[in-house]
Design a protein with these regions (language model features):
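Short, positively charged and aromatic/hydrophobic N-terminal segments
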Residues: 24-35, 39, 43-52
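Intrinsically disordered, low-complexity cationic segments
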Residues: 4-6, 24, 213, 238
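Residue-level detector of alpha-helix boundary/anchor positions
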Residues: 21, 26-27, 142, 230
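A composition/secondary-structure signal for short, hydrophobic, low-basic-content segments
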Residues: 1-3, 21, 35, 210, ...
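Catalytic cores of nucleotide-sugar-dependent glycosyltransferases that transfer UDP/GDP/TDP-activated
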Residues: 39, 53-253
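Alpha-helical and His/Cys-centered functional microenvironments
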Residues: 11, 20, 29, 43, ...
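Serine residues within intrinsically disordered or low-complexity segments
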Residues: 13-15, 19, 34
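N-terminal amphipathic/hydrophobic targeting modules at extreme N-termini
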Residues: 3, 8-10, 18
Length: 253
């Protein structure tokens, strides 16, 4: 809704002259408009423009969202994701999957309810065929959406090859990286591999699928999905607090 309202406001601001044209010429209204009349009519036109703008939009069948803070409470992004999960679950009901880092290995994670039954066949396939070690369960928040936690540590062995691929394809420079860049990048890449594996095993090109990557820590995975699974639409959302925390935590100006 926020996006639609923003688009509407932009259309409203760009189409003010067009609105007056419609009011005075198409409808041939011949009396003098007061400010209230003009405002009322332009608001109506705004709604008409929005309707024609969004009437052909598609609703996805499946949604994947990845974030460093899925089942891993660090800061504000956790709040953003966890508070909207219940609404998304009501609409998509177990067709939305949150992907997070498996950073609680060997310890009990109070935010994660593991299940041996959820996606069991795919989980086995992912391990045996795609070399992905994942745990599947539910996020212990209202709505309890399905969560896939991926072990990204094995990807450190392929780090240089992954960075080379990112440079050759997208000119993403990793030579001057510092701090938590490597860890975030390996998780991001692993999350992209999870989407690819799940899609190839469970879904088809007739399914409308969206992958939303939250913050710079998941950007590399979004690039990977665009290349490896072009059937999946990608969205990248930045949360400025995370960038600031990374800069401050590594004593950078």
């Amino acid at each position: 809704n926020a996006v639609l309202h923003l688009q509407g406001d932009v259309l409203f601001s760009l189409s003010t002259n067009f609105s007056f044209f419609l009011l005075t010429h198409i409808f041939r209204i011949k009396y003098y408009f007061s400010k209230n009349n003009v405002y009322f009519c332009t608001r109506i036109l705004k709604r008409v423009l929005i309707y024609y703008m969004v009437k052909d939009l598609l609703t996805p069948d499946y949604i994947f969202e990845s974030s460093w803070e899925v089942c891993n409470k660090v800061g504000g992004i956790y709040t953003v994701l966890s508070t909207r999960a219940n609404t998304l679950q009501e609409k998509f009901r177990d067709r939305i999957f949150f992907i997070g880092p498996d950073v609680w290995q060997g310890k009990e994670n109070p935010l994660f309810i593991e299940s041996d039954n959820l996606c069991a066949a795919w989980k086995k396939h992912a391990l045996e065929k795609d070399e992905l070690s994942v745990r599947v369960g539910r996020w212990n928040i209202p709505g309890e959406p399905i969560v896939i936690l991926v072990d990204f540590q094995p990807f450190f062995e392929k780090k240089n090859d992954i960075y080379t691929e990112m440079w050759n394809r997208y000119q993403v420079d990793s030579l001057h990286a510092y701090g938590d860049y490597d860890e975030a990048s390996m998780f991001s890449y692993a999350a992209g591999k999870v989407v690819e594996s799940f899609y190839r095993y469970n879904l088809t090109e007739t399914d409308k699928v969206v992958y939303q990557a939250h913050e710079w820590m998941t950007g590399m995975g979004a690039l990977y999905v665009q290349e490896a699974v072009p059937e999946v639409a990608t969205i990248f959302t930045t949360h400025a607090t995370s960038i600031g925390r990374s800069i401050a935590g590594n004593n950078k100006p």
